[in-house]
Amino acid sequence: MKYYLAPLEGITTYIYRRAYHTHYRPMEKYFTPFLVPHTKKDFNTREKNDILPAHNPGMNLVPQILTNDAKGFLDTVEKLKGYGYDEVNLNLGCPSKTVVSKGRGSGFLIHTEELNRFLDEIYAKADVKISIKTRIGKFDADEWGELLRIYNQYPLEELIVHPRVQQQFYKGTSGSGCICGCSEGM
């Protein structure tokens, strides 16, 4: 089993990660709260402070990107490479209504053709490792088979699965049966 510190917006900032890493059992990976691509040349002050290697000493930090726009994703990857990052995580798991209403996070999962085109482009053009955090669907666990088929087409660094659909947020029974079949489908 691998131990990772999942991102929680507004909580697991570099200050929290640094304190945790110093005083508790270090995690194998730490994920940043999601970065949303924007057109500015660089990250804003909060984002920059969160990803600066000097603020995250000794940690295997993976910046997380939340978008449904391949160009925005690729532009953000280029900015992150400037800070020395060679791995990013694509957030396809966020269930927040404000995120989902824009077709991002788990809101992207229902648009399988667009998702497949998006992944085609980012995996063809990005020269970093890309992992994906996903849910098993937006409305129903039956969506998982198609999502897994799509993911299997790409050289994912790893697939991190939250075994719930977007509609469940963080409540209800998990779809752990989907996960049991995950290794068979990969």
How would you name each of these model-derived features?
Residues 1-186:
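Flavin-dependent oxidoreductase catalytic cores
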